[in-house]
Curated annotation (Swiss-Prot):
GO terms for cellular component: intercellular bridge; nucleoplasm; nucleus. The gene is Usb1. The keyword Nuclease applies. This is U6 snRNA phosphodiesterase 1. Belongs to the 2H phosphoesterase superfamily. USB1 family. GO terms for molecular function: 3'-5'-RNA exonuclease activity; lyase activity; poly(U)-specific exoribonuclease activity, producing 3' uridine cyclic phosphate ends.
């Protein structure tokens, strides 16, 4: 059996949670006073816990509690000041697309009951990487410059395929792109140039561009490849107006860094 293609998500799903939040940098006090004059004494009283609890620290990232994220495990440990960053093309699901999912998911769950629908849909143009907080705005500006020349285009995603993340801790059912591949390669080429400028990991050598539909914890390839994949493909092929439904207009590139989103409209 061939190995399932890899997807560019972190194990905790960079698209559905911030891996880290920015760390504030304390500034040294001025400590200035006139020559020969002692500074005024000061006394700092402790802040009551009841008050501190009203204002969670922005320097602390989310706890690495996999139970809070559907059993997902972080690919990289949280460090203060590090932001998980992901570049992608968003896909806004309409009612007809949800109707298709309502048929696909129950069939897939017959083979892998732990499967759940993705909370949002997108097509990745990068792996999930870690940015230092002070890199975010320069990174986004360079990315915007690289994306400025790209025009909107249609692509079709209609081939059912099974994916895993690099650590084999999550499995995905996706719809692979069957048209528009060349345009995505051009975009990834520019995204990779940005990554190299910031000494970050580039995208996969031979990417399989796709929109993930559902996922589960663990390596479920044995359950999902073969008969299940074939049955899901038949559902897609026979679904009413699937040819038009799965033809998507790429209108913008989006960068998610921690809990911040940056949109770059295509021309």
């Amino acid at each position: 059996m061939n190995a399932a293609p890899l997807v560019g998500y972190s194990s905790s799903g960079s698209e559905d949670e911030a891996e880290a939040v920015a760390a504030g940098r304390s500034k040294p006090g001025s400590g200035l006073h006139r020559c020969g004059q002692n500074p005024l004494p000061s006394q700092r009283f402790p802040v009551p816990d009841s008050v501190l609890n009203m204002f969670p620290s922005t320097e602390e990232g989310p706890e690495d509690d996999s139970a809070r994220h559907g059993g997902r495990i972080r690919t990289f440990p949280h460090e203060r000041g590090n932001w998980a960053t992901h570049i992608y093309i968003p896909y806004e699901a309409n009612e007809e697309f949800q109707d298709l999912l309502d048929v696909l998911l129950p069939r897939a769950q017959m083979f892998a009951p732990r499967l759940v629908q993705m909370e949002e849909f997108h097509l990745s143009l990068s792996q999930s990487v870690v940015l230092r907080h002070h890199w975010i705005l320069p990174f986004v500006q360079v990315l915007k410059d690289r994306m400025a020349s790209f025009q909107r285009f249609f692509f079709t995603a209609n081939r059912v395929k099974i994916y895993t993340n690099q650590e084999k801790t999550r499995t995905f059912i996706g719809l692979e792109v069957s048209s528009g591949h060349a345009q995505f390669l051009d975009m990834v080429s520019e995204v990779d140039r940005v990554m190299k400028e910031f000494d970050l990991t580039t995208f996969y050598q031979d990417p399989s561009f796709h929109v993930s539909l559902a996922w589960c914890v663990g390596d479920a390839r044995l359950q999902l490849e073969g008969q299940c994949q074939q049955e899901l493909q038949e559902i897609v092929d026979e679904f009413e107006d699937s040819e038009m439904l799965l033809r998507v207009l790429a209108e913008q590139v989006r960068c998610k860094s921690g809990n911040k989103f940056f949109s770059m409209p295509l021309k």
